[in-house]
Amino acid sequence: VVQAGETVNGGTLTNHDNQIVFGTANGMTISTGLEYGPDNEANTGGQWIQNGGIANNTTVTGGGLQRVNAGGSVSDTVISAGGGQSLQGQAVNTTLNGGEQWVHEGGIATVTVINEKGWQAVKSGAMATDTVVNTGAEGGPDAENGDTGQNVYGDAVRTTINKNGRQIVAAEGTANTTVVYAGGDQTVHGHALDTTLNGGYQYVHNGGTASGTVVNSDGWQIIKEGGLADFTTVNQKGKLQVNAGGTATHVTLKQGGALVTSTAATVLGSNRLGNFTVENGKADGVVLESGGRLDVLEGHSAQKTRVDDGGTLAVSAGGKATDVTMTSGGALIADSGATVEGTNASGKFSIDGISGQASGLLLENGGSFTVNAGGQAGNTTVGHRGTLTLAAGGSLSGRTQLSKGASMVLNGDVVSTGDIVNAGEIHFDNQTTQDAVLSRAVAKGDSPVTFHKLTTTNLTGQGGTINMRVRLDGSNTSDQLVINGGQATGKT
């Protein structure tokens, strides 16, 4: 027992030793006290800091326990793997090198550093301030591994989450003024206030709320079904993702920031063009850029959508998007069962979901359009990283232009009543077997291959390729390219 007014310097506690501190203990090494397991009230060994007691520069090793009761205080404790600190008083400058810190009701932990495999549990009625979290996310993004990093059931203030760090805010917990850097993340089941994502991620789960989050470059806020975000600001190269059933209100989307959502979510806020809304299956005034994406689902609609460089508008069959503005680098994903109308770099374009007729499409940068059976695409331009797919019974009209890096995929017999200009790749595909879905494929003799025919009035080669299949089994059947009434020119 170290009595009040006494000071003990150095020493080791082993083999069920017990030190009761009312005075001051400096430089102790503790390797006993956890005989009944971590954070177990049955433990009686180790170092106990009582009301008015102080411990400085303590080392807690495997199996060791430092217990800080109400009114006690410790500083500069280092806890290795297998050791723990049970805190009902105050602890400053604790380092968890694989060890654990359990902050109980009334306890306050200040400037705890949680290194690899370390764990801090902040319980209801407890507080942790200025914590640095360097572990917890090694299992991958949003993995619910709650045995490393920081778990918050009480209050955590001014936490810094670095690469590989994770803070899990439980349903009854609150995290305030957290900064998350690249490679770290915050999982929110309770309340997160004023989080800054400097390349890090924030996941807001069902029942969780996040207010005042700032998403900076490479940061990502994900609102899951039943989650709520309020007053999120998305700066350049930041991303806000709102899943179906999630809600984000009072969003400020700055230029260069990305919004990823669908018409099954609720998102309300402002962007560089004014106010926008996504609610009740309708989207209005959404701006998509820099990795942003809006999915318009079947039976839902969108109006006045702007798709800029890096943005994607995806319209499902039975969905409708009107007054769309597509600029250079924007991507449209749809099929002939969707209804879309607007303008792109070539002028007006449209898709009539009832007739299956499309006109003036520009597909680039990941954009794609599928012409279903009975549908037709007229005057289509497929740019770099764009794809035009035609099902059996789909057709082309007017001028179909494939630029370098573009693809046209034929899943059946297709007729073009106009011109095809090819600087990209034309693929004859086979939906019935994976064996034949190969560029420049030679079909195996026993493979169930269905060969296709492309018929066009004119074909102009501009250095593109046409990938056709042939069966080498004596029949020599193959895909076919038929020039009907016109000519083939150029180089393919």
Indicate residue ranges for each PLM-predicted region.
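Extracellular beta-solenoid/beta-roll
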Residues: 10, 95, 268-271, 304, ...
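Phosphate/pyrophosphate-recognition segments in soluble nucleotide-handling domains
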Residues: 136, 260-277, 345, 350
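Short, composition-biased local secondary-structure segments
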Residues: 222, 276-281, 295, 350, ...
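Intrinsically disordered, low-complexity Ser/Thr- and acidic-rich flexible linkers and loops
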Residues: 35-43, 138-147, 436-443
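Intrinsic-disorder/low-complexity loop/linker signature
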Residues: 18, 27, 40, 144-146, ...
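Fold-core signature of tandem repeat domains
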Residues: 2, 8-13, 19-21, 25-30, ...
